Each structure stands twice: as structure tokens, then as C-alpha cells.
Amino acid sequence: MTQALKDLGEYIAQALPQDVLGTEVNRCGELSLTVKAASIVKVMTYLKDDAGCLFKQLVDVCGVDWPGREQRFDVVYHLLSMKHNQRVRVKVATDEETAVPSVTGVFSSAGWFEREVWDMYGVLFSDHPDLRRILTDYGFEGHPLRKDFPLTGYVEMRYDDETKRVVYEPVKLTQDFRSFDFLSPWEGPGMLPGDEKAN
């Protein structure tokens, strides 16, 4: 299956050489394409309509926050081809001010997914028919899945029995959180705590 995905990645990259920046089959056997943000509609249309691809189902659109990068956000599209029994992941990099073209014209289901990415990360989508919050309250400040968003949020919302309505109050904590450097390396297969002292 891995070779078939590598061949598919090469097939797509050869068909769209100006739009596809890179292809990769990861160790889990998943094909990822990195494409130019301006080309996302063209690439998604090709993946949906080309006889060698036929990725007719948009499974999900999600965001990833990389605060250390200049283009801080990745928008990640997950597609499924029932005809060829294959999946592909399409990644686009963007920053806080640059809008990614909406793919709602190609996959209508992208409407809610893109709204969720905007609500959680603040990634803008141009030509979206209804870009507004979908998971948080209308008066919510900020985007809660960004790594620099405070764990406690900014306000606390609760129902007040006396006034018979929802009220917003500043967050009150009995103990402050410790400072956390979210750019520090984490324990993982390539780095263990204390490795930096070994050299």
C-alpha cells in the first residue's frame, strides 16, 4: 500500500507541478500533500474529479498551530476515495492575516469545517458563504485552540438564578497556573529530557 501511495503522490505532483510543494508518505502509511494556499481550490477540484484520484468525500478540515513559524497555521484537509479505497491529507500553510480560499464550491461540507477552523484558530477563509463562530459563544474573545490562548480563558459564563439569565464574569482562580513555555521541546522519540546535557 505504501508504494501505491508514493505512486499516487508522484502522479498528483506531476499533474500539478506549480501547485504541489511536496508529497510524503509517513511511517503510518498516510499520503500527505503540501500545496500552495492560493492553489487549494484547483488542487481539491483535481483530487475530486481526476479518474486516478476520485477523492469524492471531504472527511474533515482541521487546523494546527505552530507559533514558532512565520506561517503559523496549517489548514489540513482529509479526503477519502471510496472508488480506490485511499485517503489523502492536503496541507496548506498560512498566517494570521492571509486568507485561505474556501473550498465550499468544491465540497459543500467544507462550510462547517472551515467555520470551526476559523472559530478555534482564527484562520480566515476568503469567499466563504457564512464565516462566523460555530462552537463558541457569539461574544467570545479569541480563538481557544491557539497555543497562546490562556488555559482558563478570559471570562467565565454561568446561569444566574436571581437574574434568570446567563452572566459573564472575570475568571477567579484559587491558585495561579505555572508559566509554561509552549515552544520548548517535548519528550518524544527524538528527544528525551536531559539529552541536552549529554553533549
Curated annotation (Swiss-Prot):
Q: What is this protein called?
A: NADH-quinone oxidoreductase subunit C
> Transport: is it a keyword of this entry?
yes
Q: What is its EC number?
A: 7.1.1.-
Q: Which reaction does it catalyse?
A: a quinone + NADH + 5 H(+)(in) = a quinol + NAD(+) + 4 H(+)(out)
The record describes its quaternary structure and partners as:
NDH-1 is composed of 14 different subunits. Subunits NuoB, C, D, E, F, and G constitute the peripheral sector of the complex.
GO MF, any single term: NADH:ubiquinone reductase (non-electrogenic) activity
GO CC aspect terms:
plasma membrane
Annotated membrane topology is: Peripheral membrane protein
Q: Where in the cell is it found?
A: Cell inner membrane
Query: PROSITE patterns, per this entry?
Result: COMPLEX1_30K
Q: Write the lineage as a comma-separated list.
A: Bacteria, Pseudomonadati, Pseudomonadota, Alphaproteobacteria, Rhodospirillales
- Class of enzymatic activity (EC top level): translocase
Q: What family name appears in the similarity comment?
A: Belongs to the complex I 30 kDa subunit family.
Q: What does this protein do?
A: NDH-1 shuttles electrons from NADH, via FMN and iron-sulfur (Fe-S) centers, to quinones in the respiratory chain. The immediate electron acceptor for the enzyme in this species is believed to be ubiquinone. Couples the redox reaction to proton translocation (for every two electrons transferred, four hydrogen ions are translocated across the cytoplasmic membrane), and thus conserves the redox energy in a proton gradient.
Statement: the UniProt record of this protein carries the keyword Membrane: yes
Q: Which UniProt keywords apply?
A: Cell inner membrane, Cell membrane, Membrane, NAD, Quinone, Translocase, Transport, Ubiquinone
